[in-house]
Regions:
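Bacterial N-terminal signal peptides that target proteins for export
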Residues: 1-9
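Hydrophobic h-region of N-terminal signal peptides that target proteins for export
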Residues: 11-21
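Extracytoplasmic and endomembrane cell-envelope/extracellular-matrix remodeling and assembly machinery
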Residues: 21-392
Length: 392
């Protein structure tokens, strides 16, 4: 016992002496090695600032090691470092680590104090923040969290309780649960899809193995469907999932199989199937893509699906279709220079010259590809060379 204590004291003394000697780059490198090896005694000795430009790093490594062991956390030391390095990447990173630990342990009081100082919270921390608000009885938290149901594909563990609460409080319908299952299966997030499917009403929950079969061998699954598959919601949904997955590898084969069973689906279900098939066809530059998109009607689509719908309409020379597709995009996508330009072209082709000019004016006047094209539509042309006075 005495020997082990002496050995520990000797190790600490050695680390202190080494830290005093290595006040330059060597100290920083030694601190990095101590952090990697988990040598907390050496790391503590190297953490004190010594006038080096990289001093925040050893201190960060030391505090990060504390955050990993809740019993060792010194909130005052953490806050002092965070305040001293406010706005720096290391401070943001350390605060995020601290908040994750607080969230995992359900220490919502401290979490609520520290979270507002985070400048760019990642998705898992946003979900911990929703958990904190729910724990504190914030009645607006679920309403603000509801968009996660529709937008979240890669689902951090901290978001699962929030999604579960949306289901428990009946803030998402069975149709919306199925829509999430579809989207997760489209993105090949099968595990999360199975989890979401488990939240369906009992009479609609599919067997997890059926979801896997529909995704793993979609052609075989569709070819072996029983005649009465469409009698239940799960039967139709699994067929739709298989069609969407098959369309990725054999788009025409998916459409042929869809035609055999299209009357078994509701109008909304037919729109979904055709939207998936058209999306894959457009990416393969198949001439049928535009026709299939039109047949899909106004079925809800992801941003990527809508963008390919506009491209398919462009390839088909359907300016009305181009306009309707771009106008259906969210503003963040529709206002990007490429889509603003093509919307302007569509408006011009459809006789809406004033609307076209306004769009070209919005994006013109910059040394960028679509800006130059917009200037040409406005009759300005493009002048090469360095602007006068730039080199003065």
């Amino acid at each position: 016992m005495k020997n082990s204590v002496r050995a520990a004291i000797a190790a600490v003394l050695w680390a202190v002496l080494a830290a005093q000697a290595d006040t330059g780059d060597e100290r920083i490198l030694a601190a990095r090695d101590a952090a990697r090896s988990g040598d907390r005694a050496r790391l503590a000795a190297y953490a004190a600032p010594a006038g080096h430009v990289l001093d925040p790093y050893p201190e960060y490594w030391w505090l990060s090691a504390q955050v990993a062991r809740p019993a060792d956390i010194d909130p005052a030391a953490l806050r002092e470092f965070l305040e001293r390095n406010r706005g720096a990447w290391l401070a943001e990173k350390l605060r995020g680590e601290w908040l994750r630990g607080l969230g995992r342990r359900g220490e919502w009081g401290t979490f609520a104090i520290e979270y507002p100082f985070l400048e760019q919270p990642e998705q898992d921390l946003q979900c911990y923040q929703f958990q904190a608000r729910l724990a504190n009885g914030d009645g607006m938290a679920l309403a603000e969290a509801r968009p996660l149901w529709f937008n979240l594909v890669d689902t951090p563990e901290s978001c699962v309780p929030v999604l579960q609460t949306l289901v428990r409080e009946a803030l998402v319908s069975p149709d919306e649960i199925w829509a999430r299952v579809r989207r997760l299966m489209e993105a090949k997030r099968n595990t999360h899809a199975r989890y979401a499917a488990s939240w369906l009403p009992a009479d609609q929950v599919p067997a997890p193995s059926d979801l896997d079969k529909a995704a793993a061998n979609p052609a075989g699954y569709l070819d072996r469907l029983p005649p009465n598959f469409s009698a239940t919601r799960p039967g139709r949904e699994l067929a739709l999932i298989a069609l969407a997955r098959l369309a990725r590898d054999d788009t025409l084969g998916a459409y042929v199989r869809y035609q055999r069973m299209d009357e078994r689906f509701s109008p909304a279900e037919r729109g979904y199937a055709l939207g998936q098939i058209a999306w894959q066809a457009a990416q393969r530059l198949m001439p049928e893509a535009h026709t299939w998109y039109r047949a899909a009607g106004d079925t809800p689509m992801s941003d990527e699906q809508i963008a390919w719908r506009a491209r398919a309409a462009l390839r088909a020379g359907d300016w009305k279709g181009v306009r309707s597709a771009i106008e259906a995009m969210p503003a963040s996508l529709r206002e990007q220079p490429d889509w603003a330009y093509w919307l302007g072209r569509a408006q011009a082709a459809l006789g809406k010259q004033d609307a076209a000019r306004r769009l070209f004016e919005q994006i013109g006047g910059h040394p960028a590809f679509y800006s130059i094209l917009a200037d040409e539509e406005l009759g300005r042309g493009f002048e090469e060379g360095v602007p006068e006075g730039l080199l003065a």
